Amino acid sequence: MAAADDVWCRETVPRVMELVSPRLPQRDACALLAVSPWCYRVLVANPKLWEVLDLREMKNPGDRLISALSLVRYRHLKVLNLEFAQDIEDRHFIHLKEMSGISLEDLEFLNLNACQKISDKGIEAVTSLCPNLRGLSIYWIVGLSDSSIGHITKNCKQILDLNLSGCKNISDKGMRLIANNYQGLKKLNITRCVKLTDDGFQEVLRKCSSLESLNLYALSSFTDKVYKEIGSLANLTFLDLCGSQNLTDDGLACISRCGGLTYLNLTWCICVTDVGVVAIAQGCRSLELLSLFGIVGVTDACLEALSKSCSHSLTTLDVNGCIGIKRRSRDDLIKLFPLLSCFKVHS
């Protein structure tokens, strides 16, 4: 029996832990290290387990990060999540940069969302460590400036996904740096980057022609100069224009040239009428989600156009606040849009 128990502890349990651990949250997988010396050895030797480091919302994230990156098992880290790690500071990244043997060359995605104590200096330090980064999210770090964009474009040449949402001090200068360095950019989120103007963002649209996802939520200063340029993005599938108060039917007609669009948010685009939505219906026949929330200038005519062109793709339609569109029964809606699973209409 003793021999059987020994085999169970040394071989069976560690093997089971190795099979189970990839399906667990990383924090739980780390806890398994303490089960036994045999589990520790088996799990540490599995490189797939240590490609992600998740310090989201953790206390003392800076010290934890430095300690983790000092371990051999994190040498090939691919994903680092520091979202809402509010105590992370510039000094932690600067310390990592100065440490010998620390490299993040395999890192592909870095999430610094809402790390408010990070400044341009911190961005310079951390991006210098990860030259092969492909995705960077710095959502709502309001103190960052165009200098951060300069550091990012200098240090990370392969960025495909960039989230600058809430970075209110980024200006047209930053947009020009993005345009000149990331022609292959796939995803860009500039929600609430309120200093941007048509001139700077048009350069991005002209040079980053591979864009597939574009989030312009709460940018009310852009005009049809920008929206007409969006129509040249042949690969665009996701477009959020919520609050684009200067978007007109002419601009929307140009956007309708993006035939691959599956997601289009036109919430509070108050200048839009049936004319623009009909153009979208005719040009974007793969739409799965469309929000017309709060647009009083649309009527049942646009629903009829959508039912003719998008009836076999549209699953979500929001016409809440569209007083020109009459209420319909569930059965009537299904006749128009057989795949519809979510329909929001005004009371």
Report each predicted region and the residues it spans.
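Conserved hydrophobic beta-strand positions in leucine-rich repeat
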Residues: 53-55, 78-83, 107-112, 136-138, ...
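N-terminal/domain-start segments enriched in small and hydrophobic, helix-friendly residues
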Residues: 274-292
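Alpha-helical scaffolds that organize eukaryotic protein assemblies
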Residues: 110, 121, 127, 131-169, ...
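Short, solvent-exposed loop/turn at the beta-strand->alpha-helix junction
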Residues: 35, 59-65, 86-94, 116-121, ...
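Inter-repeat linker/turn residues at the boundaries of leucine-rich repeats
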Residues: 48, 75, 86, 102-105, ...
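N-terminal adaptor-interaction module of cullin-RING ubiquitin ligase components
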Residues: 1-101, 105-114, 119, 123-127, ...
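A structural signal for leucine-rich repeat
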Residues: 68-72, 93-102, 123-129, 149-155, ...
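C-terminal interaction modules of eukaryotic adaptor/scaffold proteins
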Residues: 286-290, 297, 301-347
